[in-house]
Amino acid sequence: MANLMMRLPISLRSFSVSASSSNGSPPVIGGSSGGVGPMIVELPLEKIRRPLMRTRSNDQNKVKELMDSIRQIGLQVPIDVIEVDGTYYGFSGCHRYEAHQKLGLPTIRCKIRKGTKETLRHHLR
């Protein structure tokens, strides 16, 4: 496996990665802000509910291009997920999510924001 060097903006240089806890929580990438704001987490695909999936269809050419890209360089942009009462709802990244499914990947990188039921209702309008 090759080593990868990247230049990060100063605002991202304080991020750290930690392994999953003994209770099976997913690995977390977070800032030094004490848990305020979104977290980047690898979540199992089956833990993410996709409430808008039935109302939209994905461009299969875009899904194929993303599959090729993910195979070569991995997922570059996490999908956005809202956590409400311990349940994860995905509202962006439909093509990236489907590409992960078709590749048989068990997890996907997510940017998680905590939300309320009212936030969830707002996204479903």
From Swiss-Prot:
Result, substituting residue 94 to S: Loss of activity
Transit peptide, residue positions per record: 1-22
The enzyme's E.C. designation: 1.8.98.2
Single GO MF annotation: ATP binding
Main localisation: plastid
Keywords: Antioxidant, ATP-binding, Chloroplast, Disulfide bond, Mitochondrion, Nucleotide-binding, Oxidoreductase, Plastid, Transit peptide
Tissue spec. comment: Low expression in photosynthetic tissues such as leaves and sepals.
pH influence on activity: Optimum pH is 7.8.
CDD domains: Srx
Catalytically driven reaction(s): S-hydroxy-S-oxy-L-cysteinyl-[peroxiredoxin] + [protein]-dithiol + ATP = S-hydroxy-L-cysteinyl-[peroxiredoxin] + [protein]-disulfide + ADP + phosphate
Superkingdom: Eukaryota
Subcellular location: Plastid, Chloroplast; Mitochondrion
Gene Ontology CC terms: chloroplast; mitochondrion
Gene3D superfamilies, A to Z: Conserved hypothetical protein from pyrococcus furiosus pfu- 392566-001, ParB domain (3.90.1530.10)
Function: Contributes to oxidative stress resistance by reducing cysteine-sulfinic acid formed under exposure to oxidants in a peroxiredoxin. May catalyze the reduction in a multi-step process by acting both as a specific phosphotransferase and a thioltransferase. Required to switch on the antioxidant pathway to regenerate the oxidative damage. In mitochondrion, catalyzes the retroreduction of the inactive sulfinic form of atypical Prx IIF using thioredoxin as reducing agent.
Matching PANTHER family: PTHR21348, SULFIREDOXIN-1
Family designation: Belongs to the sulfiredoxin family.
Name of the molecule in the record: Sulfiredoxin, chloroplastic/mitochondrial
Lineage: Eukaryota, Viridiplantae, Streptophyta, Embryophyta, Tracheophyta
